[in-house]
Amino acid sequence: MELTDADLLARVIVDGDQHAFGELVRRHQSPVRGLLRQLVRADLELADDLAQETFIRAYKNIRSFRGEAKFSTWLYRIAYNVFRENARKRKELVGIDEERLQAEVDPQTPDPGLRHDLMNALANLPLHERTAVTLCCQNGLSHDEAARVLDIPLGTVKTNVLRGREKLKKMLAAWAT
């Protein structure tokens, strides 16, 4: 029987079980890296570095997890904060080097060209819309969970997702012609 995130968290907090934390990292590493890749526009090395920093901070601050939201929501919040701090240091919060955009080809995606176009379109969205769309549409967070991660009002998240999706549709339609 596989342990839940809550069970693993209890083992980490109560017993200091590093293997339990390793399992949490294994479970959540891919979604966290995916979010960070979208935020840094597919710079794989930077996304990996930020993901590592995210998990280091999560481990150091695990006792501050109050359980008011899912563990993944708490982790996404840490990842977003790590991204913002890095961007501030690099003075790139608004514009990140476009030439770094790389297409990820998912072997399970029937049309790799479509995935490439979607990643390019996502990269062209403003950061606030790209982040909201990535959290809600790609990572499956509810609007409420995304609002907690981003520390913005629920209505703002809904607006950012709606506008981002509309812009994506327009960009993809324009590229198809």
Kindly give the residue locations of the regions a language model identified.
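Internal acidic/polar
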Residues: 2-7, 85, 91-115, 120
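Short, Lys/Arg-enriched C-terminal cap helix and immediately downstream tail that follows
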Residues: 88, 165-177
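Structural recognition of an alpha-helix C-terminal capping motif at a helix-to-coil junction
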Residues: 49-56, 69-81
